[in-house]
Each structure stands twice: as structure tokens, then as C-alpha cells.
């Protein structure tokens, strides 16, 4: 049986994600962000609810991306996720994209020219952000064109780079429905952005989200729930440069900006520059919120849930892979567990996120 990996956030899970799972082949393993997102946002609903939604709509296994993989720039996010999926035996990687191109060809380009491509990045002016530099790199070495807001396409390029030398088949699937950032409700396949924007429109949510009750009946989280915690961290931290990726310039800008900022958007707008993108600033503010220092990654793979078919696959891997199915007295990943504790502080109805939790099991799947 083909084993297909999918890297996802499901923030929240919606009909477009269900379409991706239905289109992908074979046994489907999801490497999913935990309670904080790649662009530096708290998850709308917690990782366990999102896992359950995925498993009820086509996923066979859901594993958690550690905090220091989940909250990273595209290249590191892709590299960490693909490394985990390779340990779980994937043969191909399926992903949605605005531009279906020959990503497999891009793997070969990077395998042959990685040194030259990396060297080229160092020649570009420091005023450019890292995403701008990487776009120029792909344009020069592979002739890849960029047309406005194409975040999934940009992630696809990172997947190609991270897949070099790994013998993975990339399977791009054309994104259907609304664009990534669209707030438009008039689509059967509405975007996650539109769903987050219109959470109070239950009729829209019920048509846009499979198993919509799981979304409607659980706490909806955003930076608004954590801004006071962040402000306290910034104002009372003796040395922000001890936080991951915070340099002297950013520390100074953040310390000044927090004194006049009433919410996260104002703070991000004040701190961001051409060099420091808004996404990067949000990630750094997330690092400050959870007091993240130098990154370390766990050896084990945390299993959030599986179907009967997924369980059969995991049994084959159990003796050769460090699979974590319950976090107890022995920790899995200290940083992720700390981030979970802070996430839980945002709302009294969020249950324990780490200690003692066991995988979600969906038993109504037939074994093939």
C-alpha cells in the first residue's frame, strides 16, 4: 500500500482539507502543527480536536510537529516535518498548491546545485527578507515565477528543498475554492481565513467545516487571549536577546513598541520592517510568550491519533521507531509541553494538552 505524508496545520480543518485527503492515495499520515502555528499564531482550536476532525475525514495517522518545527520559517518547518514523516515510512508527499508545477524537477535542481544556491543567498542585500531572497534564488536557478500571494506554492518549494536526497515523490494537488487569504463566504471550499473571520455565522460554518460541531462547541483562541501574558513577558524580561532569534535591534524595537500597542496587530505593525516580515515578528513574539531559548528537538514522535488502518501501520514501526503514545512522568518535548501549558491558560475550558493524554482512536475504518 502506498504511504502518503501530508504536512498540515488544519487551522481549522475545512472542506478543502477534506478534498486533499480524499484526493491523496493510500494510507495517509499527517504531520500536524501543535497549539501554535507556523506564522506565529495560537491555534484556533486545540491540537486534539483538530486531530479528531482529520481522522474522521480521511486521515489514518496524525503525529505532532514539535514546537521548534511548527513555529519556524518555511524551510525549517518543511525540513523538520519531512524528517518526521520519513521515519514513519512515507513514499510520497501530497500538498495543496496554487501552482501545480514539476516540483520533482526542483528536487533534482537542488540536489545538483545546493551549494551554489546557498552561496547565492549570501550575496543578496541584507535589506531583503529571507522569503524574498529564496524567491530570487528559485527564479535564478530554476526559472520559478511568483505571482502575488501564493503561500502554499512557496511551501511547496520548501518541500522540494527538504526532500533532496530522500527519494520522496512530491504530489502537488491544485488548491480548490477560495484563495488562501480570501475572506469570501461564497465558496463551498471556503478558506481557513474566511472561517476564522466568520465564526459566528453557524450556517456558513456548518457548510464549510466537516463535523462542524467540533469547531463550534470548543473554545476559539486567538492572540487576544494571550496579549496580556505577552505584554507581561516583554516588560518584565531582563534580556530579550536570550530568546530564540531576538537580536539587539529587535529587542529594542519590541520593548519600545509594547508600551504603545493595544493589541497584537498594532505591535506587529510597529515592529515589522522590510527586513523583519510580519510573519517573522509574530513567530518571535510567540517565542517570547513561551520563553523559548535555543531550539532542541525530541527523538520520539508524538502520536495524536489513528484509525484502525493507521494502527496496523504503527505496529509495524513500533520496534524500530521511538513512538510516544502517552506523555507521563517522562517528558516528550519540554518546549512543546511548556507551550501547551501556556496555550491552556488562554481559556478555562481548554483541557490538559500533554500529561496523561492518549491518542484519539477511530475504530470505524476497515482494514485493507
Curated annotation (Swiss-Prot):
Q: What's this protein's function?
A: Catalyzes the formation of N(4)-acetylcytidine (ac(4)C) at the wobble position of elongator tRNA(Met), using acetate and ATP as substrates. First activates an acetate ion to form acetyladenylate (Ac-AMP) and then transfers the acetyl group to tRNA to form ac(4)C34.
Q: What is its main location?
A: cytoplasm
What is this protein's name?
tRNA(Met) cytidine acetate ligase
Compartmental location: Cytoplasm
Reaction(s) catalyzed by this protein? cytidine(34) in elongator tRNA(Met) + acetate + ATP = N(4)-acetylcytidine(34) in elongator tRNA(Met) + AMP + diphosphate
Q: Molecular function (GO) terms listed?
A: ATP binding; ligase activity, forming carbon-nitrogen bonds; tRNA binding
GO BP field: tRNA modification
Q: What is its EC number?
A: 6.3.4.-
UniProt keyword annotations, A-Z = ATP-binding, Cytoplasm, Ligase, Nucleotide-binding, RNA-binding, tRNA processing, tRNA-binding
Binding residues for ATP:
7-20, 96, 152, 175
Which InterPro entries does the entry link to?
Answer: Rossmann-like_a/b/a_fold, tRNA(Met)_cyd_acetate_ligase
Q: Does the keyword ATP-binding apply?
A: yes
The superkingdom of the source organism is: Bacteria
The species this protein belongs to is Streptococcus pyogenes serotype M3 (strain ATCC BAA-595 / MGAS315)
Which sequence ranges form a coiled-coil region, renumbered to this chain?
none
